[in-house]
A protein has these predicted regions:
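Gram-negative bacterial Sec-dependent N-terminal signal peptides
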Residues: 2-22
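Short, well-ordered beta-strand segments
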Residues: 69-71, 125, 182
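Helix-loop-helix "hinge/cap" segment bordering the ligand-binding cleft or interdomain interface
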Residues: 91, 98-100, 145-151, 172-214
Length: 214
């Protein structure tokens, strides 16, 4: 049993060292040339951004950070993040990303438990923006506005422009601070019968009732 334990420990150490050894600009270039196209950024701009991630990861590893754990509900967008982007981040930075995919109800339950206990079982949570009220009232969720501009500035991608994100109003609390960074959203589509809007009898009834044209 003692020998087996040592073997497992050695294998784990090899895995961690292996990720660090593979990580770097060559891996970043591979992902830029393949998965990260097309892009609004040029490949040189993408590489400059990847270099920032690589250097930031080295600082985090020096502080003992080897893995980042994230959880989200199981939908196609998050499956891509868990299976593809997590792999890209790991290969480029050497820091492993463990992205759990579970049911939406389980995400809410685990989040609620973590907030009540004051101990988070994940480093990052992807939750619906309609929980913004809960996040604000509990006072347990990191205020991203202050963090990214203060204590977390060193770990915040300098290329981020919050104006590029759609829906930040829905992730901002009553205090004007942002508690969630929009990740994806469901588009609302409204369908209507165009022919009904063209019927004279309906137009006449509408104007008679409301005083203006349909």
């Amino acid at each position: 049993m003692k020998v087996q334990f040592k073997a497992i420990a050695f294998a784990a150490a090899t895995l961690v060292l292996g990720h660090a050894a593979w990580a770097g600009e060559a891996e970043a270039k591979k992902w830029i040339d393949s998965e990260f196209q097309p892009s609004t950024l040029s490949k040189d701009q993408q590489m400059a951004e990847m270099k920032w991630f690589i250097e930031a990861a080295k600082k985090l590893q020096a502080k003992g950070v080897k893995e980042i754990s994230v959880v989200s509900e199981t939908i196609t967008t998050h499956e891509y993040e868990a299976k593809t982007l997590a792999k890209a981040f790991t290969e480029i930075t050497g820091i492993t990303v463990k992205h759990d995919l579970i049911q939406e109800g389980d995400v809410v339950e685990k989040l609620q438990t973590s907030m009540q206990s004051g101990k988070s079982i994940y480093d990052g949570w992807i939750s619906d923006s309609d929980l913004i009220g809960t996040h604000y009232r509990y006072g347990k969720i990191l205020n991203l506005t202050d963090y990214m501009g203060g204590a977390g500035k060193e770990w915040t991608n300098p290329g981020i422009d919050i104006k590029d994100y759609i829906g930040t109003k829905f992730t901002t609390g009553p205090d004007g601070k942002m508690y969630q960074l929009p990740d994806q959203q469901f588009a609302n589509l409204y369908w209507f019968r165009a022919d009904l809007f063209e019927r004279k009898d309906i137009k006449d009834k509408f104007k008679a009732k409301y005083g203006y044209d349909l």
